Amino acid sequence: MKVILLKDVKKLGKKDDVVNVSDGYARNFLFPRKLALEAKESNLNLLNNKKEAERKQKLAELEEAQKLAEELKNQELILKVKSGDNGKLFGSITGKDISDELKKKFKLDIDRRKINVENIRQLGVYDVEIKLYPEVSTKIKVKIEDI
């Protein structure tokens, strides 16, 4: 019997796979636990529609990330922080600081973990990489100034 897996099943397959199993295994184990559906024409159409919708959504997210990357490409953020002698900062600039500044200036909500910051402990201008999507990243200039 062919079934469509609704969840990952060990030693059988991943979610949305169409696999061949014995009738008893399907009726007595997979169906009662809602791990699979019978691979009828209507269920296969549902699966195909679902996969198509997911593909379109990923494509839309990718396009949006690329537009955002173009917008941010040549932008400069200015962070004003306290510093001591020789331009050394009290503490350091983190991804959270940059994320907060992006939220203030551009009204963008970018997760701090997606911002790749080297150790910024001095005043100056730094290139910071922002990963917007698995294949899309951009660099912005961050200027650190004394208050």
From Swiss-Prot:
InterPro entries: Ribosomal_bL9 (IPR000244), Ribosomal_bL9/RNase_H1_N (IPR009027), Ribosomal_bL9_bac/chp (IPR020594), Ribosomal_bL9_C (IPR020069), Ribosomal_bL9_C_sf (IPR036791), Ribosomal_bL9_N (IPR020070), Ribosomal_bL9_N_sf (IPR036935). GO terms for cellular component: ribonucleoprotein complex; ribosome. Pfam families: Ribosomal_L9_C, Ribosomal_L9_N. Belongs to the bacterial ribosomal protein bL9 family. The gene is rplI. Keywords: Ribonucleoprotein, Ribosomal protein, RNA-binding, rRNA-binding. This is Large ribosomal subunit protein bL9. One of its GO terms (biological process) is translation. It comes from the Bacteria. HAMAP family: Ribosomal_bL9. Binds to the 23S rRNA. The lineage of its organism: Bacteria, Bacillati, Bacillota, Clostridia, Eubacteriales. NCBIfam families: L9 (TIGR00158). GO terms for molecular function: rRNA binding; structural constituent of ribosome.
